[in-house]
């Protein structure tokens, strides 16, 4: 059994839930905001300097967080497009793509491991849907790419592997997390997703 299976996935939690977690640890709630901001900057728990060792030990006894690792990275010599193959904690892999435009950097992220939609033009449907990505794994693609690039990502399109609305609850949580002002602060107007179930048109989500 994976040692994280019975622990709380902190990166999937919104700030009020993390505040409740710290309250249960007997720690002040302001620690939650410190941890939230650090996680969303891609900082490991060990590297956080404003949380004590004793508090970190209490956190790791009950919870965890981590980010996808880069298994492969390809950079286009033509337009600077970056293609990432990210490996998740369970060994599954998903793809993300960085695209550079005059208005900023856009990342295309995956929402599932595999896909059950069966679109003939898409190779990710061959083996069907393996599983949904957790909010932390959706967010983790953006954080890992931001950390690797050393630049701010200003736009997100959810048009990678998987069907976003087939993973509705986790995607909605992700949208709230990625737009939080203490996190990456990418507003809804800068996020688009594809809906292959019906029209295959992009739909933007506004506050």
Residues of each region from the PLM?
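Glycine-rich beta-strand-to-loop/alpha-helix junction loops that act as flexible
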Residues: 159-162, 194-196
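Conserved, mostly hydrophobic/aromatic
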Residues: 115, 156, 193
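Canonical Radical SAM [4Fe-4S] cluster-binding loop centered on the CxxxCxxC motif
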Residues: 100-137
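Alpha-helical scaffolding segments of alpha/beta enzyme cores, especially the outer helices
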Residues: 140, 144, 170-177
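Conserved alpha-helical substructure of the radical SAM core
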Residues: 126-155
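Flexible, acidic/Gly-rich N-terminal and inter-domain linker regions that tether
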Residues: 1-105
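Single conserved hydrophobic/aromatic residue that forms the stacking wall/gate
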Residues: 197, 201-207
């Amino acid at each position: 059994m994976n040692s994280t299976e019975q622990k709380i996935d902190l990166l999937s939690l919104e700030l009020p839930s993390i505040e409740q977690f710290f309250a249960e640890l007997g720690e002040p709630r302001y620690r939650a905001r410190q941890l939230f901001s650090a996680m969303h900057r891609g900082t490991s728990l060990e590297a956080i300097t404003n949380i004590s060792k004793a508090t970190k030990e209490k956190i790791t006894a009950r919870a965890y967080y981590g980010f996808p690792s880069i298994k492969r990275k390809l950079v286009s010599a033509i337009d600077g497009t970056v293609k990432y193959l990210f490996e998740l904690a369970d060994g599954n892999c998903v793809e993300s793509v960085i695209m550079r435009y005059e208005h900023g950097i856009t990342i295309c992220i995956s929402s599932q491991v595999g896909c059950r939609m069966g679109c003939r033009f898409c190779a990710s449907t061959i083996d069907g849907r393996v599983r949904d990505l957790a909010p932390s794994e959706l967010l983790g693609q953006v954080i890992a790419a931001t950390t690797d690039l050393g630049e701010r990502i200003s736009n997100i399109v959810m048009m990678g592997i998987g069907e976003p609305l087939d993973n509705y609850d986790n995607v909605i949580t992700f949208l709230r997390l990625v737009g939080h002002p203490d996190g990456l602060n990418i507003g809804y107007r800068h996020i688009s997703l594809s809906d292959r179930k019906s029209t295959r048109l992009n739909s933007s989500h506004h506050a």
